[in-house]
């Protein structure tokens, strides 16, 4: 079969042929793939620097995708084998796709939903009427997250980012306040303090970590013994601005901050089933009705090597079609 093959860690996958995978045990399903998104996770695994980097080479790359089961059902699934190929093997934890949702959109959405709905709904337990801050919201996942927060009834949706044009677009998607990130982290801290005093922030979804997140933490710090706190649930879902922060004991002792992470390692098997069987079907229906949007750029499998590292428009997901 044809596929996107990785021959060496740190190299770009190439178009080639490899043996078609077969079902090995009960609970596995063969899928004829029609579309698969290229995500940061996929690139990290091919780099050799990710904890889940590929080991047996050559191999088909791609973590998830869309296609048809042997009975003709069109589904989204996460691959037991690589998904950017004509055929793959997935588990029973797949999600049927509505008829009026196209393959490219269905392939592009799940990772962004995983990175936004799971932090919001599963980790932070967002409730209608709460105020949410997305730190680093101008990427694909942040843009989807803003729409999901609005869908679930968030009152104030504050977003940060460097791309002013995307920040303006986020207002149309549900953002109520936008903050432009610069190198002046002290200014960000003061802005967050002012917002938090006026409309207490209940949930923070952070995609950046590093210095911008450090400023947000500092903004929540209580400054006197009579400080009256409100609970702030902070979920880290990325580290695009840095791998480390400086967390002092005083920050955690002076206010009620609940700091947690969201990612494959922090989500239980049961939570991932909820994602595939409850959350994702709901989001697919929203997208099919035109109420959840994602920007995509699609290219055929044959040009995988040329487009793998292509610079896309901000907030756009690359999708490979087969």
What residues fall within each predicted segment?
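Short, glycine/polar-rich helix-capping loops at beta-to-alpha or helix-loop-helix junctions
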Residues: 83-84, 161-169, 244-249
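Glycine-rich beta-strand-centered segment in the early N-terminal region that forms part
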Residues: 21-39, 47-82
């Amino acid at each position: 079969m044809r596929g996107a093959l990785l021959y060496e860690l740190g190299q770009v996958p190439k178009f080639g042929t490899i043996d078609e995978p077969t079902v090995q045990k009960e609970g596995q399903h063969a899928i004829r793939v029609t579309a698969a998104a290229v995500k940061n996770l996929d690139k990290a695994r091919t780099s050799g620097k990710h904890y889940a980097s590929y080991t047996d080479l050559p191999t088909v790359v791609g973590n998830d995708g869309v296609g048809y089961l042997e009975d003709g059902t069109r589904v989204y699934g996460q691959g037991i084998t690589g998904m950017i190929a004509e055929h793959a093997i997935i588990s029973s934890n797949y999600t049927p796709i509505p008829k009026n949702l196209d393959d490219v959109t269905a392939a592009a959405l799940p990772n962004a939903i995983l990175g936004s709905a799971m932090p919001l709904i599963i980790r932070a337990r967002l409730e209608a009427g709460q105020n949410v801050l997305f730190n680093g919201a101008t990427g694909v996942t942040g843009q989807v997250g803003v729409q999901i927060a609005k869908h679930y009834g968030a009152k104030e949706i504050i977003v940060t980012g460097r791309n002013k044009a995307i920040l303006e677009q986020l207002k149309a998607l549900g953002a109520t306040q936008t903050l432009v990130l610069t190198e002046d982290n002290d200014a960000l801290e003061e802005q967050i303090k002012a917002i938090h005093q006026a409309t207490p922030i209940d949930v923070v979804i952070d995609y950046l970590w590093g210095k911008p997140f450090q400023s947000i933490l500092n903004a929540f710090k209580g400054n006197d013994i009579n400080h009256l706190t409100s609970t702030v649930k902070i979920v880290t879902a990325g580290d695009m601005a840095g791998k480390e922060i400086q967390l002092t004991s005083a920050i955690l002792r002076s206010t009620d901050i609940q700091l947690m992470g969201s990612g494959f390692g922090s989500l239980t098997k049961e939570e991932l089933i909820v994602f595939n069987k409850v959350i994702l079907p709901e989001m697919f229906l929203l997208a099919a009705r035109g109420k959840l949007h994602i920007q995509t750029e699609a290219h055929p499998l044959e040009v995988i090597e040329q487009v793998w590292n292509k610079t896309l428009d901000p907030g756009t997901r690359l999708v490979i079609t087969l």
